[in-house]
């Protein structure tokens, strides 16, 4: 698990630790190719039963985190997840004596379009230390056209 490298930032908020990263173009392209293929598959599996938002124009699909196109992405989120846990523990309780291993349990996509709504929410996890993340691979032009914060 040592070939994937990514710069990221840790944001400490009063009751939250927020991690942020910008993925490489290669990784985003691999994700988008996988997702485009997934959308075209007749046997795609809907993940909509767990949906919090109102996605009427798009879909929520189960992704195979072991798929070759997702290998680097899956490895990266596991590395970042382990680092997140390490930073959280070191800042809130006693630091761990050993690094934790993070494994991907579920991965899904939310394909949203105009009129769809997916509010900020949290996810239940199968373990006490379960974590989740969000990744945007395509951003609507009207969002990109907005002024950048702080400028």
Q: Which residue stretches match the model-derived regions?
A:
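Non-heme Fe(II)/2-oxoglutarate
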Residues: 1-96, 115-118
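A short coil-to-beta-strand element that immediately follows conserved catalytic motifs
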Residues: 91-107
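Extended, compositionally biased low-complexity polar/Lys-Gly-rich tracts
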Residues: 39, 46, 50-51, 56, ...
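Contiguous hydrophobic segments
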Residues: 3-4, 8, 101, 146-147
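Catalytic core of non-heme Fe(II) oxygenases with the double-stranded beta-helix
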Residues: 106-151
């Amino acid at each position: 698990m040592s070939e994937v490298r990514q710069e990221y930032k840790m944001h400490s908020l009063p009751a939250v630790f927020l991690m942020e990263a910008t993925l490489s173009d290669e990784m985003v392209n691999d994700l988008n190719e996988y997702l485009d293929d997934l959308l075209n598959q007749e046997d795609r599996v809907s993940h909509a039963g767990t949906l919090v938002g109102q996605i009427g124009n798009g879909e929520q699909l189960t992704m195979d985190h072991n798929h070759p196109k997702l290998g680097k992405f899956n490895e990266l989120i596991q590395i970042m997840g382990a680092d997140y846990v390490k930073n959280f523990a070191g800042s809130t309780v006693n630091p761990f004596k050993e690094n934790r291993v993070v494994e991907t349990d579920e991965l899904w996509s939310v394909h949203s379009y105009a009129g769809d709504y997916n509010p900020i929410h949290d996810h239940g996890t199968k373990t006490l230390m379960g974590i989740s993340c969000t990744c945007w691979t395509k951003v609507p032009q009207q969002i990109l056209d907005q002024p950048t914060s702080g400028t």
